[in-house]
Amino acid sequence: MIYAGILAGGTGTRMGISNLPKQFLELGDRPILIHTIEKFVLEPSIEKIVVGVHGDWVSHAEDLVDKYLPLYKERIIITKGGADRNTSIKNIIEAIDAYRPLTPEDIVVTHDSVRPFITLRMIQDNIQLAQNHDAVDTVVEAVDTIVESTNGQFITDIPNRAHLYQGQTPQTFRCKDFMDLYGSLSDEEKEILTDACKIFVIKGKDVALAKGEYSNLKITTVTDLKIAKSMIEKD
């Protein structure tokens, strides 16, 4: 089975324009989270869309699904997210297992709730690549020079940009593989390894690159929100 896991566990309101976490802010005529879920609803191979939200916001998320996506709510599960990204993925996979016991071939397409401009092509590419690889990371080529500084004051390295990519989401892998690899980490490793695909890489797994889009914007600042609103208006 193919599942989607939407990471919506953040509670930050640092934009300073609302008491709502970013994923619940309005973008056009509906919340960012709803825009994101809608993209996954369009992919018929996805059995369930599991949304991991902070425990304080579970009821709010359920209300939004009832209001904006009543025809699809049977395909959507709202569950409690974790304290960080990877524990949220873990909770999402546990919710999938509660819905239907996991098999070794079950795949989860994980995605940031605040990237509402994901395309169906990106979702389908992730699913296709995940059939033949251990994991998939969605990326775009780096367009700016990346500078490394180990002390925050002086440049220590300027890597070859031709070999560099900017990571986005989705990140896709088999549910059981993630649970096994994450479970094998020490507490210290769990603190350091906050990116799911990095866990696969350091464990020697095959992580394929899926082509992202520069328009696959992650809305984290007021400027990002302004750009997103202009993109919605153009559509």
Curated annotation (Swiss-Prot):
List this protein's GO terms for biological process. Answer: cell wall organization; isoprenoid biosynthetic process; poly(ribitol phosphate) teichoic acid biosynthetic process
- Which annotated residues bind CTP? L7, A8, G9, G10, G82, A83, D84, R85, N86, T87, S88, S113
Query: Which residues of this protein are annotated with the site description Positions ribitol 5-phosphate for the nucleophilic attack?
Result: R161, K218
Annotated site location: Transition state stabilizer: R14, K22
**Which UniProt keywords are present, listed alphabetically?**
Cell wall biogenesis/degradation, Nucleotidyltransferase, Teichoic acid biosynthesis, Transferase
What Gene3D superfamilies has UniProt attached to this entry? Spore Coat Polysaccharide Biosynthesis Protein SpsA, Chain A
Q: Which Pfam families match?
A: IspD
**What PROSITE patterns does the entry give?**
ISPD
Broadest EC class? transferase
The EC number(s) attached to this protein equal: 2.7.7.40
> Which InterPro entries does the entry mention?
IspD/TarI (IPR034683), IspD/TarI_cytidylyltransf_bact (IPR050088), ISPD_synthase_CS (IPR018294), Nucleotide-diphossugar_trans (IPR029044), TarI (IPR034709)
Q: List the disulfide bonds.
A: none
Q: Which superkingdom?
A: Bacteria
Q: Which GO terms describe its molecular function?
A: 2-C-methyl-D-erythritol 4-phosphate cytidylyltransferase activity; D-ribitol-5-phosphate cytidylyltransferase activity
| Assigned protein family | Belongs to the IspD/TarI cytidylyltransferase family. TarI subfamily.
Q: Outline what the protein does.
A: Catalyzes the transfer of the cytidylyl group of CTP to D-ribitol 5-phosphate.
Q: Which PANTHER family match?
A: 2-C-METHYL-D-ERYTHRITOL 4-PHOSPHATE CYTIDYLYLTRANSFERASE, CHLOROPLASTIC (PTHR32125), RIBITOL-5-PHOSPHATE CYTIDYLYLTRANSFERASE (PTHR32125:SF8)
Q: What is this protein called?
A: Ribitol-5-phosphate cytidylyltransferase
Q: Which organism is it from?
A: Streptococcus pneumoniae (strain ATCC BAA-255 / R6)
